[in-house]
C-alpha cells in the first residue's frame, strides 16, 4: 500500500502557481468530441483522472495525444457509443460523455460512473434534460443507455438543482440540438463559464454566462478551439489551507482570488493574514498565535462556500480556539476524513451532513487513511500542524485531482516523502 509520510511543524515559504482546474479540464476533454475541427487544451496537468479520460477517449475512437504540456484532439473517423465499465467506474466525470456521444453516434451506454464515495450523486437531472431534448433513456441495472432516432431539439428546461455536471451536460447537448435551448436554474460556478468560453470559441452561440439562465441558439457546427482551462481554485484553496495549518508566508499566483473568495474570507476570519494583488494572493500566519474558531460554514452551490473546500476548512479549524460547525448541503458523506482527524487527536463528531469541531486540538502524528480526494488533501494539511510523523495511507485518490501535491508542498518547505 502506498504511503505519504509527513513531518509536521515545518512552516511554509515561497510562491506557487496552481495548474489548470481538474473540474474544468475533464468536461472540456469530453466536449472536444463535439467539434469538427482540431482542439488544443493548453497546460493540462498530469492527473490520474486526465489519464483515465484519455483512455476513455481512445476507447470510443477519438484521436487525442499529448503535445508537451498540451492535449491535442482531431475529429475521429468513427466513434463508438459503448463506454468501457472499468473506465466509467474509475471516475465520476465519465458522465460528461453522455451528451457528446449521443449527439455524435446517436447511441451511448454508460455504466454507473465512479469517483469519490461522497454519497448519492444521481444523474437524474442529466437524463431528464436529455430526455426533454428527445433522447430515449433506458436504465438497466448498473448502466444507462440513451438513443436518438433523429436530431435532438431545443427545449426550455428547468434544473431541479443547480448541478454543475448537469449544466455542462445540457450545454453540450444544446449545442447540437435543433433550435433554441433555455436552461433555467443553471449552475454558475467558474467552471461553467470556462465551458461556455470553450464552446463559444468553437462557434457556439451561448448567452447568459454567469447567470442562472443560459440560452443556446444552435444551428452551426462547432469547429474546435485552442483553449487554456482556468486555474484550479480548489488547488489554490488547498495551498492556502496548508499555510493556515503550518504557518509561514506564501504567495499563490495566477489564480483569480474571486474564484475562491469564500475560502479566503474564511481564512481571514481565523486570523490568517490575507492580501490580494491582481491575480496573486499573499498569506501569512505566525504558528505561535492560535487561530480563531467559532466558524459556522455551510457548503452549497456557487457563490456559497465551495463543497470541495469544506474538508480543508475542517483541517484548519481543528486547532483553532472555539467550537466550529460545517454543514455540507450537497454531499452526504463529505466528512469521511473525520475518522482521520480523530485519530490525530481531534474530538470532532459527524451527525448527518454536519461536522462539529470543538477546536483547540493538539494534533499528533499517526497512521491515517485517505477516504477520498479532498478528504485526503485535508488530512495531509492537518498533518502539517501535527507533532511528529503522520503516515497517510492509500493516498491514491489525491493524484486524481492534484498534480504532485506532496511535491508542491515540499517546494514550499514541507517535509514530505
Predicted segment positions?
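Short, structured segments at the rim of ligand-binding sites
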Residues: 1-417
